[in-house]
A protein has these predicted regions:
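Glycine/proline-rich active-site loop of Rossmann-fold NAD(P)-dependent oxidoreductases
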Residues: 14, 39-52, 59-61, 66, ...
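C-terminal "lid/loop" region of Rossmann-like NAD(P)-dependent oxidoreductases
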Residues: 68, 96-99, 107-114, 121-139, ...
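Amphipathic terminal alpha-helices
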Residues: 158-179
Length: 179
């Protein structure tokens, strides 16, 4: 897809890609550009949708969604991200190339909230807020073909990753309370 720096954040990512490419062209330094998409896992900040929803559900608090929740995302478990990035470095399979690090299995934000509430057996309610301003991405889905070539196993299924994360947060909460 064409690069469109719609925000300072996305513009810096495009700039970093261009700098890496220039090192290859100028100094013949081999590079592999990895582009992570919605990685989640233990110790992730609650500023991100996955951990934010799980923390809310575990505490039976409302889960807020912008708009109708039809915007889609894909989620990549941290272990898959690490394995793909490490193998990209050691295998030299995609030198001077770009590898999207993420799942290509889409889920709507509403479905994600419902799934998390179900897995957590939560009493949380879903609250809809006005949609974000125009320009917010309604769909993010990477082509994960190259990433799949770097993994020795299938991507972690979303339900498996969420269940692992829920167990992690529960254990961590118990440890914190025991101190």
């Amino acid at each position: 897809h064409p690069f469109q720096g719609q925000s300072p954040y996305s513009a810096t990512k495009i700039g970093a890609d261009r700098i890496a490419e220039s090192y290859f062209r100028s100094f013949e330094l081999p590079v592999t550009i990895v582009r992570p998409f919605n990685t989640y896992g233990p110790r992730q900040s609650t500023d991100f949708v996955m951990s934010k929803f799980i923390h809310a559900a575990l505490n039976d608090k409302d889960i807020t969604i912008y708009g109708d929740g039809s915007q889609t995302r894909t989620f990549c478990f941290i272990d898959d991200n690490i394995e793909a990035c490490t193998n990209a470095f050691y295998q030299n399979k995609f030198v001077n190339d770009v590898v999207n690090i993420g799942s290509d299995i889409e889920i709507t934000i509403l479905e994600l909230a419902q799934k998390i509430i179900s897995i957590c057996k939560s009493k949380s309610k879903i609250v809809h807020l006005p949609p974000l301003k125009e320009g917010d991405m309604t769909r993010r889905k990477p082509d994960a073909t190259k990433m799949r070539e770097l993994l020795v196993h299938d991507l972690t299924p979303l339900d498996t990753g969420i269940k692992y994360l829920v167990e992690h947060y529960i254990k961590r909460k118990k440890l914190t309370e025991a101190e």
